[in-house]
Amino acid sequence: MDIFFIGIISYLMGSIPFGFILTKIFLKKDIREIGSGNIGATNALRTGNKSVGYTTLILDILKAIVPVIYVKIFYQDFLYVASLCAFLGHVFPVWLKFKGGKGVATYLGVILALSYKFFLIFGVSWLFLTFLFRFASLSSIISTLIIFLYSYFFENNNFSLILFIFLIIILYTHRENIVRLKNSSENKIKL
């Protein structure tokens, strides 16, 4: 299997807009017209239907795990291509005119498939920061930074490069949240 085919399949799997699909099917609403207008799991939770929100979270994680694990088993040389393409599929899905989610749940799927240790570090730091500050966006950004720094200083530098790319894209997708955090107008989450 060649790198192009792996990239396309991973991208297409990552681009399945589960938040959009689930809110259409179960709530008869367009998630892009709810809350932040984002198709991801956090905004799916804002619909008021926790089942839709948590199912979106799980499916957004799984849509990265499936191609990354498959490539990890059969085509190890293309592991980072599959990881990045699945992630980019979520953030820039072809089905929704390249306007997707912020990428955090899909990023979680990638790091879980690549390293359960990174997944645990992310999870613990995200929960701690969320309980401390009550901002999902801030917790996601800082936790992604923590994973990159941990990888850079203590792990494989090849992995650090892909994690740096994820960090830059997550910062980009959270640019409006960053402005709201600076202006003290970012919505806190309820725990």
Explain the meaning of each model-derived region.
Residues 2-26:
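N-terminal signal-anchor transmembrane alpha helix
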Residues 20-53, 175-191:
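Cytosolic, membrane-interface loops and tails of multi-pass inner-membrane proteins
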Residues 1-6, 65-81, 112-119, 151-162:
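Helix-coil boundary and interhelical linker segments in multi-pass alpha-helical membrane proteins
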Residues 45-48, 71-75, 89, 104-133, ...:
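Interfacial segments of multi-pass membrane proteins
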Residues 4-9, 53-54, 79-84, 120-124, ...:
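Hydrophobic alpha-helical transmembrane segments
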Residues 11-15, 24, 87-97, 129-134:
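Transmembrane alpha-helix interface/packing and boundary motifs in multi-pass membrane proteins
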